[in-house]
């Protein structure tokens, strides 16, 4: 999302200060229009590098999350309430890679918006909506993991497919409603009319956000974030206690193999750890952006444009991180990827393939 990347703090510069590169002289986004925004293009070398970096992120977000969705939806062994949440999260990140990143890439490198005023607003709505959708999904996933770790045997009856569906529906409906109401009602621009008028030009895409809405945006981000931090703190305390109890019982009984309950608890702790890393990656990507946006709104938008864009693209790259995290920690996901890319997923009864080693 780029709530702030669409705000009054944006101008027509791109991700790194043009002064850092040998840029050509200033041009216009539309040479034949008097109201055209000024464009300061990069020289060919840096321009190619930026397109490669941003394009790689978009491709990774699209392909990686598509693999996650395909794996979970195709293989029956992965059909669980928790995994459906993960697939829905991957869908939000996939849409960032398809609907947001390519257009932001052109704007960041070229310094102009070439996709029309209507799609400027729609692009911002997608940006905001998919961001908060990811956030809400991660929050619900953390609650799911807490239930699974704290009471693994009762977990299947507490977090059912119905509960998962309600969480998914809530995440999508709330985030889309919030994103579109923020942009299309014009409430975020209240009190900034003169500034908006002075910044308006053809080839620009600035959506002004006043201090009130910056505070609301930050609050909507902060509340689920605090929930996730609190829940995962409890998860790791419980996991640590369970590990100590299992070790103590193993020594006392000298048993050769773990009980079913212990194996379930171990599996749930591993899942909680992996998804905890995904949450940590999300927070590390998003916190700097939101903190800077919040402070900057009350200091007159003094943050240099290139700093904003660096933060924004760190945020965008977060959409590509989760598939990499799953691939690193989940053997079943690596096996699913292999079956998919080799075409074996097209074979008859491939959906019943055993993806787990244990």
From Swiss-Prot:
Residues 69-83, 144-166, 234-274, 334-358 are cytoplasmic. This is Trace amine-associated receptor 7f. Disulfide bonds join 37-201, 120-205. InterPro entries: GPCR_Rhodpsn, GPCR_Rhodpsn_7TM, TAAR, TAAR_fam. The chain crosses the membrane at residues 48-68, 84-104, 122-143, 167-187, 213-233, 275-295, 310-333. Specifically expressed in neurons of the olfactory epithelium. Glycans are attached at residues 34, 210. One of its GO terms (cellular component) is plasma membrane. GO terms for biological process: sensory perception of chemical stimulus. In addition to the well known disulfide bond common to G-protein coupled receptor 1 family, trace amine-associated receptors (TAARs) contain an unique disulfide bond (Cys-37-Cys-201) connecting the N-terminus to the extracellular Loop 2 (ECL2), which is required for agonist-induced receptor activation. It is found in: Cell membrane. Disruption phenotype: Mice lacking Taar2, Taar3, Taar4, Taar5, Taar6, Taar7a, Taar7b, Taar7d, Taar7e, Taar7f, Taar8a, Taar8b, Taar8c and Taar9 show no visible phenotype or behavioral deficits. They however show an absence of aversion to low concentrations of amines such as 2-phenylethylamine, isopentylamine, N-methylpiperidine and cadaverine. SMART domains: 7TM_GPCR_Srsx. Keywords: Cell membrane, Disulfide bond, G-protein coupled receptor, Glycoprotein, Membrane, Receptor, Transducer, Transmembrane, Transmembrane helix. GO terms for molecular function: trace-amine receptor activity. The keyword Transmembrane applies.
């Amino acid at each position: 999302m780029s709530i702030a990347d669409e705000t009054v703090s944006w101008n027509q510069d791109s991700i790194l200060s043009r002064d850092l590169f040998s840029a050509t002289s200033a041009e216009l986004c539309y040479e034949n229009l008097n109201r055209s925004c000024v464009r300061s293009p990069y020289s060919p070398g840096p321009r190619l590098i930026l397109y490669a970096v941003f394009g790689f992120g978009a491709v990774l977000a699209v392909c990686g999350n598509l693999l996650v969705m395909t794996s979970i939806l195709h293989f029956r062994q992965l059909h669980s309430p928790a995994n459906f949440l993960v697939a829905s999260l991957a869908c939000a990140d996939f849409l960032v890679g398809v609907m947001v990143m390519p257009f932001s890439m052109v704007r960041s490198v070229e310094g102009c918006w070439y996709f029309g005023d209507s799609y400027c607003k729609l692009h911002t709505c997608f940006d905001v909506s998919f961001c908060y959708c990811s956030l809400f999904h991660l929050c619900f996933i953390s609650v799911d993991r807490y239930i699974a770790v704290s009471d693994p045997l009762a977990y299947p009856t507490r977090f059912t497919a119905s509960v998962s569906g309600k969480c998914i529906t809530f995440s999508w409906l709330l985030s889309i409603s919030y994103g579109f109401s923020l942009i299309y009602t014009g409430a975020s621009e209240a009190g900034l009319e003169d500034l908006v008028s002075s910044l308006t030009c053809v080839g620009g895409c600035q959506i002004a956000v006043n201090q009130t809405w910056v505070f609301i945006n930050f609050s909507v981000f902060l509340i689920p974030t605090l929930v996730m931090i609190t829940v995962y703190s409890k998860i790791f305390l419980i996991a640590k206690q369970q590990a100590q109890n299992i070790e103590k019982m193993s020594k006392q009984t000298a048993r050769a193999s773990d009980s079913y309950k212990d194996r379930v608890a171990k599996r749930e702790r591993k899942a909680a750890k992996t998804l905890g890393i995904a949450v940590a990656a999300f927070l590390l990507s998003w916190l700097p952006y939101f903190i800077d946006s919040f402070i900057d709104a009350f200091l007159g938008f003094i943050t240099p444009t290139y700093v904003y864009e660096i933060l924004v693209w760190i945020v965008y790259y977060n959409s590509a991180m989760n598939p990499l995290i799953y691939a690193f920690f989940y053997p079943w996901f690596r096996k699913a990827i292999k079956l998919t890319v080799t075409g074996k997923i097209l074979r008859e009864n491939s959906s019943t393939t055993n993806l787990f080693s244990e």
